[in-house]
Regions:
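A short, well-structured alpha-helix characteristic of acyl/acetyltransferase catalytic modules
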Residues: 19-25
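Conserved beta-strand termini and adjacent loop/short-helix elements that scaffold enzyme active sites
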Residues: 42-44, 88-91
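Short, well-ordered beta-strand segments in beta-rich or mixed alpha/beta enzyme
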Residues: 2-9, 40-66
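Amphipathic, positively biased hydrophobic alpha-helical segments used for protein targeting
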Residues: 17, 41, 84-86
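Short, surface-exposed ligand-recognition loops at beta-strand->loop->(often short) alpha-helix junctions
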Residues: 9-18
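An amphipathic, aromatic/His-enriched active-site/gating alpha helix that lines ligand/cofactor pockets
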Residues: 25, 29-37, 55-88
Length: 91
């Protein structure tokens, strides 16, 4: 199993509005992917910071997710927003 955890770090209220607008579709598409066990993104007490937690069944599933995201509206339109993620492999 692959887990990703960390934060999405917006710099402006405009970035936060963009994340809020695009996030529902991004969550729905990700949760429908083969191998997605869990996908949670939530705004923290700081409105510019979002907590992210993902679990995928295998590295192959996780890598397929990463490829889809890069080409998606979410990936293209939020590429400028800083990510602070840790990826770990669990038995």
């Amino acid at each position: 199993m692959i887990e990703l955890s960390g934060r999405l770090l917006c710099e402006t209220a405009g970035d936060t509005a963009l994340v809020s607008a695009l996030l529902p579709e991004h969550i729905a598409l990700t949760r429908a992917e083969p191998g997605c066990l869990r996908f949670d993104v939530q705004q923290t007490a700081d409105p510019l910071v979002w907590s992210v937690f993902e679990q995928f069944r295998s590295r192959t599933d996780f890598e397929a997710h990463q490829m889809r995201v890069k080409a998606s509206s979410w990936g293209l339109r939020t590429a400028h927003i800083k990510r602070d993620y840790t990826v770990t492999e669990k038995a």
